[in-house]
């Protein structure tokens, strides 16, 4: 049995000001997006022919960051705590309180990329296929931030690597944040980076992202402690699982359509 180290959530103390680990994880995700994106533009010439430049990459990050933050926050309020935020709508703006939803952030990014595509004269799936392999690094960094903060812990377990989170209780639990780091971060990155290493049918890389993330998230949710204010929903599935199922279904449909073109 392992014990969570209970890290200080503030990574860097600067007098009365502190830089939190979770903020650093966002920064790592954004910087990795730029570095990997520039590598692809320089070493995979078909992306340049599709209209990708360093300027477009920088602007895509700006649009995407807005989509992640706004969509993630609104998604959390809508999917997880809608009753609370209906009576406290102004607190949606308090980003330092409450949480963020990946599925809301994903929808926010889709809207942002639609606007970006229209403004730059690019195709939506041309953008999403380029962006999709860059995203898992940020997802993995975010899950590592969850682990450092000791949040989103797993269900009770007697496995050798089960971990006690002392600030929660004395029960050994799945370190589900690390499972998500390995699957949604490392495994999904390797899969998408490999698949997109040569030209593919338009939409197929995006489809693989939907299938991969949705499947990994659905599986890990079986080890993750359900949100106390929601519990399990219909068929004993969590909110995260119900939100991930449409991603898998849409991904399978999109992959079939893409490969038939």
Curated annotation (Swiss-Prot):
Subcellular compartments: Cell inner membrane
Listed EC numbers: 2.5.1.145
Gene Ontology annotations of biological process type: lipoprotein biosynthetic process
GO molecular function: phosphatidylglycerol-prolipoprotein diacylglyceryl transferase activity
GO-annotated cellular components: plasma membrane
Pathway(s) per entry: Protein modification; lipoprotein biosynthesis (diacylglyceryl transfer)
Binding site for a 1,2-diacyl-sn-glycero-3-phospho-(1'-sn-glycerol): 143
Transmembrane spans: 17-37, 60-80, 92-112, 121-141, 175-195, 203-223, 237-257
Stated name of the protein: Phosphatidylglycerol--prolipoprotein diacylglyceryl transferase
Organism, scientific name: Methylobacillus flagellatus (strain ATCC 51484 / DSM 6875 / VKM B-1610 / KT)
Lineage, broadest ranks: Bacteria, Pseudomonadati, Pseudomonadota, Betaproteobacteria, Nitrosomonadales
């Amino acid at each position: 049995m392992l014990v969570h180290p209970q890290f200080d959530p503030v990574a860097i103390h600067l007098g009365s000001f502190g830089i939190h680990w979770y903020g650093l994880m966002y920064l790592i995700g954004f910087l990795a997006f730029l570095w990997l994106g520039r590598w692809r533009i320089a070493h995979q010439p078909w992306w340049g022919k599709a209209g990708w430049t360093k300027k477009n990459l920088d602007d895509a990050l700006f649009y995407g960051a807005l989509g992640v933050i706004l969509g993630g926050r609104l998604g959390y309020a809508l999917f997880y705590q809608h009753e609370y935020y209906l009576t406290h709508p102004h607190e949606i703006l308090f980003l330092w309180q409450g949480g963020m939803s990946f599925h809301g952030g994903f929808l926010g990014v889709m809207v942002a990329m639609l606007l970006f595509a229209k403004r730059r004269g690019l195709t939506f799936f041309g953008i999403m296929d380029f962006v999709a392999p860059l995203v898992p690094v940020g997802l993995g960094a975010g899950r590592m931030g969850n682990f450092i903060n000791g949040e989103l812990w797993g269900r009770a377990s007697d496995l050798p690597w089960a971990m006690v989170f002392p600030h929660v209780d004395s029960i050994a639990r799945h370190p589900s944040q690390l499972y998500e780091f390995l699957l949604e971060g490392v495994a999904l990155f390797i899969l998408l980076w490999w698949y997109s290493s040569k030209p593919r049918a338009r939409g197929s890389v995006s489809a693989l992202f939907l299938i991969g993330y949705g499947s990994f998230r659905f599986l890990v949710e079986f080890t993750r402690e359900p949100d106390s204010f929601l519990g399990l929903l219909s068929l004993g599935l969590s909110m995260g699982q119900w939100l991930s199922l449409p991603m898998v279904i849409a991904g399978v449909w999109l992959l079939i359509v893409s490969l038939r073109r």
